[in-house]
Amino acid sequence: MKKMLKVLLVLMTVVSIAGCSSKTTTEKATKKTKTLSGNYQVEIKVKDYGTIYAEIDADTAPITVTNFVKLSKEKFYDGLTFHRIIDGFMIQGGDPKGDGTGGSKETIKGEFSDNGVKNPLSHTRGALSMARSQDNDSASSQFFIVQSDSTYL
């Protein structure tokens, strides 16, 4: 499993972030933050797994990418682990508590069609997406990487 995970992470060169975090108690970002555009490379050092390198597209999900790049630059993710692994489906990380209940200080709007945002991205193998609770706008810092096509998400 660990080797397969490393191979998946190495092969993941172009990753897309679509909106979605399992954070339930957090403050909504109230200030107007300038959103990014274009592609960005991010690097996250995951405890016990190594470094993830990903390219994310701010033109498709500007709020999500702006948040992810900010957290990555702040080294928020470094040293965290994957707290949820479902073999053949996905791996989830980005929780400072390590149990699926934590996140960063702010939540962001989910950038996906069910939330009124035109977004052509699909959860295909290697896609990086934000985890969220039932609230469409609850994404924070938790993310997941799909291990196989999961276009029903």
List each language-model region with its residue ranges.
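N-terminal secretory signal peptides that target proteins for export/translocation
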Residues: 1-2
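Cyclophilin-like peptidyl-prolyl cis-trans isomerases
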Residues: 5-8, 19-153
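Bacterial Sec-type N-terminal signal peptides, specifically the leucine/valine-rich hydrophobic h-region
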Residues: 14-17
